[in-house]
Amino acid sequence: MKIGIADTTFSRINMGKIAIDELRKISSIPYERYTVPGIKDLPIAAKKLLEEKGCDIVITLGWVGGTQKDMLSYIVLSMGLVIVQLMTNKHVIDVTIHEDEAEDEKTLMMVAENRVREHVRNAVDLLVNPKRLQKLAGTGQRQGYPDVGPILK
């Protein structure tokens, strides 16, 4: 069993380092890291990690700028990652931070770190403890921000 971690140089923080730190805290599952320039390179990085490096799941770590072109690049990334999942029949967990999703850099940093750490836990659970995720179904979990909880009847 192995987890792939694909990150970018475009990111404003070292998301790969955070992911590895969290993975080491919660699991002894080995990992393979693959760093690429930007988010549009993440689909091929994920595919290589799955097919060439023998990973069972990949976490992609991307940072999206705040322009309209950046948003279009994110759509391309997202479509590419879905195609990789369908081609390989394996999960690719997309962990993306959007430059404009927080009002200041301190909050953006907090959201980014929390989102990375929470998705690393999700990836580990998908591999070794899927029942944990089933128990959380419908509970309003959020990665990066506080959970919102379920809608009560």
UniProtKB/Swiss-Prot annotation:
GO MF annotations in UniProt: riboflavin synthase activity
Main enzyme class: transferase
Annotated pathway: Cofactor biosynthesis; riboflavin biosynthesis; riboflavin from 2-hydroxy-3-oxobutyl phosphate and 5-amino-6-(D-ribitylamino)uracil: step 2/2
Keyword annotations of the record: Riboflavin biosynthesis, Transferase
GO terms for cellular component: riboflavin synthase complex
GO biological process: one example: riboflavin biosynthetic process
Enzyme Commission numbers on file: 2.5.1.9
Highest taxon in the source lineage: Archaea
NCBIfam families linked: ribC_arch
Similarity comment: Belongs to the DMRL synthase family.
Name of the molecule in the record: Riboflavin synthase
Lineage summary: Archaea, Methanobacteriati, Methanobacteriota, Archaeoglobi, Archaeoglobales
